[in-house]
Regions:
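A short, solvent-exposed beta-strand micro-motif common in secreted/extracellular proteins
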Residues: 73-83
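Acidic, glycine-anchored loop motifs typical of Ca2+
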Residues: 83-91
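Short, acidic Ser/Thr/Gly-rich low-complexity loop/linker segments typical of extracellular
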Residues: 48-62
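A glycine-anchored, Pro-Gly-centered beta-turn/N-cap motif
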Residues: 62-64, 71-74
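A short, amphipathic beta-strand motif
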Residues: 23-31, 130
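Bacterial N-terminal signal peptides
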Residues: 2-11
Length: 133
């Protein structure tokens, strides 16, 4: 019995040691006009909507497929089309003035909370697509 228990513990420990420490999180941005820069940002809860963990810009007319390598956990991804090329998502009285979206769809008029747009990531994900609206 002891030998079996020790073998089981060693097997579980070695399996966990072989798991990758980072996973691939990728997708594409849809709904962009193709005439302006598209900015994609990866967010953790700690710096949500203040300081992205990573950002990727796509020039006008370029493919908008992105990939982030992240530790397992909860992540949010946002994107917007920078129509006036000023480097920020312009806000109006009733919300954003430029097409934008999140990986986890959000339709509120208020500034989203991390929990409203974050998704759990514990394995490679290839279809973290964002639709700009």
């Amino acid at each position: 019995v002891w030998v079996t228990a020790v073998a089981l513990i060693v097997t579980v420990a070695s399996t966990r040691a072989e798991e990758p420490t980072r996973v691939s999180l990728s997708g594409e941005v849809r709904g962009a006009s193709g005439a302006h820069t598209v900015r994609v940002a990866l967010w953790s809860e700690a710096g949500f909507l203040e300081k992205p963990v990573e950002e990727v810009d796509f020039d006008a007319g370029r493919a908008t497929r992105y990939t982030f390598l992240v530790p397992r956990g909860r992540w949010a991804i946002s994107a917007y089309e920078d129509r006036n090329e000023n480097g920020i998502l312009d806000m109006g009285l009733f919300g954003p003035r430029e097409p934008n979206g999140f990986w986890r769809q959000f339709r509120g008029r208020h500034k989203p909370h991390f929990d409203e747009v974050a998704m759990p990531v514990d394995h490679d994900i290839a279809d973290a697509n964002i639709v700009l609206r």
